[in-house]
Each structure stands twice: as C-alpha cells, then as structure tokens.
C-alpha cells in the first residue's frame, strides 16, 4: 500500500502590502507657495517685482540642501532695519542723545521684539523648513506670547516671562524686510513706508524700561545695598532667588536661566518699591551702608576716569 502523500503546510493568507509612511507637513505649514507669497504681499500691501526674493526670504536652511535660504537676506535686513529705525528715532526725538537713541533702536530691533512681530502676523507657517525641534520651540513661544498683555512693552526688549524668543522668528522678519529693500532697489524710505506699521507699537522713550537686572542693581546702590542672585534647579526649571541685606526679596523661574534671572529681578524691583521697601531703608543702609554706597560710587568714577585716560585699572585693597 502506497504511503499517503505528504501534507503541505497551510499557507498563510497575506493581506495587501502596508502603505508607505506618509510624511505630513509640519503643523500650520502653508504648502501652497503661491498662497504663502500672496499672504506676505497682502500683509505688506506691496507687490514684489522679483518673486524669487520673497521665496528666498521664506526658506530656512534646514529645508533642502539645494534651496537658497534666507541667511543672506537676513544679514542685509538686520542692517537695513537698524538704519531705518536710526533715521526714524533721530527725527522724532530731537532732544535725545546718542546713548538713549541707541537704546531705543536696540529695543525695537531686538530678537524679542521682532519675534513677537512674526507671531502677531503669523509668519512662521509661511516658512519652508524641515526641523521638528524648531517647530516645537516656536510653538511653545507662540503659546507664551498669547498670554502676554498686548499693551505691555516693558518686558519685550529683554525677554518675556517664560521662554526666550527663538531667533528664527526674528530672522523671518529681517529677511522679508531685506527682500523688500532689495526689490525696491535699496530705497530705504520705501522700505520704511512698507514695513513700519509691522513694528507697531514702536517702543519709545516713554514706554521703555531699563534692563531689569541693571535697574535692580541701581536701585540697591542708591541705598548702599547689594543684590545677590542665588540659582538652583527644581525639576526641569531654573529658579533664581534675589537677596538684599540677607532678606529674600524676589523669585523667578523658567526653563532658561537668563529668563529666570530677569523674572527674579523684575519681582525684586516691584517688591522693593512696595511691600519690601523697608529692606532698602533699614539696617546697614542707615549708616555703614550709606558709606559703602558712596565708596562704591567713588570707585566707579575712578574706574571711568582711568578708562577715559587709558590709565592702568586701579587695584582696591
């Protein structure tokens, strides 16, 4: 009797092949480049003669190796906006000296100020890029800016209350400004006419504050006191405490150390002008502290005199 035929293993029924992974565009990205360009032109009320300039201004260096990024335009825009603001501030502030004028110019074209311009006018979704981490950082900053009072300009030049502005946002504004500047044959007056309203409200001598840490030190020095900053980590946050005359007068926190210090200085300055005012007017500040303050002022003046005369820096013992 012949043996039974060998049984073939049952074949597994295979389903259709899995589809190739689909690369989704970054959140908020405007894939239609004609629409992206049109949005900028509508925003500026300006039609580009050379559309390639605008496409270049809206291309990040991470997008593709063969694409021309905004880096060269950003270089030009940084200088062009600086000169445009110099002219404007010079003409509108006839009594201000070069120091205050420089401070106002720096405040109006700071990374923090220009980044908020980009957020206010929704420019980041128009940028061609390929950097998920950049999207994350910008997204966090946008959410933070939404919580800021719209009419509070005092914190803008030096940093907000939570996160530092990603430079890419300021770069976009500078690159777009440069695209206009080059497109109109380097006509500075035309550039200012087209872009000025983007920067409203412009920071003026009436609305600007001093750098918070500098303001705190100057306030303390007037009363013969010294502010001390103590930094420590709590989870993923940096916490900064400010002590004056041994008393805690300010606290600030952020994921970024520089912002935490700014927040602490702001908090301390507010409290020393209010609830903690007695810290500046009691203790060593009534006697020895006054002498210390005067001595510090004398040392500062001597250092300044030596610097002006190119003399060796004095050594205090």
UniProtKB/Swiss-Prot annotation:
GO cellular component terms given for this protein: cytoplasm; nucleus
Class of this enzyme: hydrolase
Keywords: Endonuclease, Hydrolase, Magnesium, Manganese, Metal-binding, Nuclease, RNA-binding
InterPro entries, A to Z: dsRBD_dom, RNase_III_dom, RNase_III_sf
Taxonomic superkingdom: Eukaryota
Boundaries of every DRBM domain copy: 211-274
Bias (Pro residues) ranges: 16-26
Record has Hydrolase as a keyword: yes
Role according to the record: Cleaves double-stranded RNA (dsRNA).
GO MF annotation terms: metal ion binding; ribonuclease III activity; RNA binding
Reported cofactor(s): Mg(2+); Mn(2+)
Binding, Mg(2+): 74, 171, 174
Biological process annotations from GO: siRNA processing
Domain called RNase III: residue spans: 37-185
SUPFAM superfamilies xref list: dsRNA-binding domain-like (SSF54768), RNase III domain-like (SSF69065)
This protein's record includes keyword Manganese: yes
Region (Disordered): 1-26
Site (Important for activity): 167
Protein's UniProt name: Ribonuclease 3-like protein 2
Record-listed E.C. numbers: 3.1.26.-
Disulfide bonds: none
Pfam family, one: dsrm
